[in-house]
Structures are given as C-alpha cells and as structure tokens.
Amino acid sequence: MTADISQQVFSDIQHSIAAFKERNSGYAEWLDQQLQQADFGEQLSRTWFGSHYAKEVCYRQPELFKALVDERAFTLLYADNAFSGRLSHGLQGIDDAGQLDIALRKNRAQEMLRIIWRDVNRLAGLDETTRDVSLLAEASIQQALAFHYRQLSGLYGTPTALVDGVQTPQEMLVLGMGKLGAWELNLSSDIDLIFCYPHSGETCGADKPMDNGEFFTRLARKLIQSIDQMTADGFVFRVDMRLRPYGESGALVLSFGAMEEYYQDQGRDWERYAMIKARVVAGSAEHARHIIDLLRPFTYRRYIDFSAIESLRSMKQMIRKEAKRRGLDNDVKLGAGGIREIEFIAQCFQLIRGGREIQLQERRVQKVLRALAENNCLPAIAVDELLQAYVFLRNTEHAIQAFRDQQSQMLPGDDYPRSVLAFYLGFDDWGLFSTELDRHRHNVSRHFADVITDPEESSEAQELDSRWRELWLGELEPPVALALLQDNGHE
C-alpha cells in the first residue's frame, strides 16, 4: 500500500471512529475494547474505508454491529441453512405485515454488513460472497412467502386442487432466474423471479371459495411488496418480473400446465438462454423437481439446433453493438471484455451442446467453463484466462457496489472513489489496478470474438456453416455427414 493511501485510510478511520462514538455514545467503551483485539482495528479500517454503506449500517444500527462481533460472525463461514434459521428466529412472534417488512430489512442490513466485511478483508472468496448474498435472498423470499401464505389462507381459505381423486393443498413456487438461480448474486443485485403453482382449483375453508390463480396472484403481490418496496428502513432486494411468460403483459402467476404450454408453443431462444440458470428457490422438493423436469426439454435440446446458432450469433452482435452505442467502456459487466461476454461464451456452448453433454447442464458460470475444458470444447489455456478474468471482474463489481450499496458496474471517474476501489481490491494505486483490468478485458474480448464467429469474420467458420446447411438439406453423403457430426461433438 502506498504512503498516500495508507495516510488516507488512517485519517479516515480516525474520523470515522470519532463520529461513531459521538453518534452512539453508549457503544463507545465497547468499541474501544474491540479495538484492542488482534486484527479488529485493521479489519474495521478496511471495511469502513472500502464501504460507506457498511459504515452507515454500523452508525445507524450499532446493535446489529455489536451482535455480529459478539457472535464472532465476521470470522465464520455460514452453513447453507444459517440465513434461513437466523431470519426465522428474528421473525418469531411477528403477525403483522408491517413488522415483517421492518424485520426483513433489518436482517438484510445485518447480513450484508457481515458479507461485505468478509469480502473486503478477503476472509471470503468470490464463491462464498455470491453464495451468501443468494442464500440471503432465498431466505428472505421463503420467510416472506410463508408469512403471507398463512395470512391469506386465514382470510380466503387454503388453495386446493383435485389430484388423483384427492383434494390436495397447493403452494406457490418461486423460480429464481439469472444470478439468483446460479447462486451468483452480486452485492447489489436485483432478483429475477417467476411465480407458478402446480394445479388449478379453488380455496377451501372459507365462506366464499377463491380461484387458485387469484389467490396466488394476491400472494405474489404481497411477496413482491415485502421484498422490493423502498421504506424508511430501505429495501430487501429489487424484484424484476419481466422474465415471466409474456413479460410485463403476462399474468403474474401461472399453473405448471400453462407454463409448459407457453414454452412449448411460444418460447423464444432468449428465453432458453435465460432458463439455463432457473432454480426453484421456494417450494417443496417434489414440486420443484416437477417444474424443472417440465422446463428442461425446452432449455436443452438433444438435436442440433440451427436456429439457436443463428440467434446466438445475432445476440453476440447485439452485445457488441450495444456496448459501442451506449459508450460502456467503463462498465465491467456490459462493456467490451466484461462479465456478460464471459457468461455468453459459457451459455453458447450450453445451448448448443447441453442437450447431449449433461456436464454442461450446470447453472454456475465457473463450473460450466471448467466443464468446457474437460470436454475439449475450449482450450484449457482459454478457460484459465476466462476464469481468472471472471473472478477479477466480479470482485471489481463488488468493490464498486459495496461503496454505497448501489446497483452499478461503472468504474468511478473521480480520484477518491478510485482510491477506495483500488484499496478494496488490494492494489497500491489506480494505475496498477487499471493495467490488470485491461489485461483481463483484452483476454475476454479475444475469446468472445472466437465464439459463434460471423461468416464475414472467418472463412473457416463460413465453410463450416456451409457444411451444416448441406447436412440440414440432406446433401451430404452418410459417411461425410457422420464425420461432421462426430468432429463437432455429436454422436
């Protein structure tokens, strides 16, 4: 660390500690005691300098900060069920929706403080950080869903359906799409959701039955409000419902049958692309398996899909054109050589080969990339460069977002936030960070250019496309057709 940044951090932490004690005099002695502990002062300095959001949580809710320290939570790797268990404990005795929303937001602030503390101090790697944010989102959805289901069932009865001759209670399932489905949420992600339920029917146990679709629509609205709405206590996660069938004009909730019919009859290639990461984040295991099994044939096809190849080529062109049109050079996600291009490379192979190569039916980008090397879909050196770039870019994204809890992937332009970002990522100055960033983005751009090559860009690719068309039209002799299929990973 350079002398300039060291002095900046030292000056900042002295001022921040004084401000904390002034605003929270009842915690002043406690903080002084903690500062005597090994590593605490250094970790506090890194956290408060690297994340003004984390510092504000400590200022405004010192009881949450103290509880984490007393529990030694900053030193602990949480088990998968820890987030749900901690939140469930905090919701005990709550029977009012307003109190639920306050508790959800309080829990979010506390858990994000822990996650950012561990991230900036490199007590957690990228996989743990994204997993923890995703599990926090899952727990919030599950607990809010269960609360509102109980509340609405008390008013309108329990939704049921006739299944194998038996009236059976029905539940609403929540599909987590995108990064939530893949346990890859960043520090300030929105969450893409789709709601569905197994069978049509109506409620029972109330004076006037209600159609299941209406019941679950009301439930969905309550859930979104509890998670998404900005209040005096903040929000939990921004909710995006645009990936559902028919988009913003579609029903908020669909039955399994209606979902299956939509994707079979009207599902588009970009929806296949989106469905790769889909995962049930709330709902019973039995119904979760059922809906995923219904959607799998739409996502992964066991034959060569020529239209998908062309759609992916168009998508690739759109990605590059959008980056140029919007001037996204400083965007580590959407700009050239950014996170989206790495995700596109992985998902291209999944859509084209995933139906035949089960190892590619994986939600997490890093696992897909490793599978591509193992299956000789990409050279090992290319995969290694992409993996290194992915970790670097995602860590950069987190450093940007942790600063003020803002959903941004744009590199800062001013000196102070630049010095904070470089410090968060362990660089002595912005210049060293920028050089490393350029190296990774250059590597990603090079590999992105080689995927689904435009015919005009490569005579070899043009020749291969011509051979595929001849195969499609039945113009190749059987031995030649067989060799073409085998050479390109198809039996």
Where is each model-derived feature located?
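A nucleotide- and high-energy phosphate-metabolite-utilizing enzyme signature
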Residues: 1-491
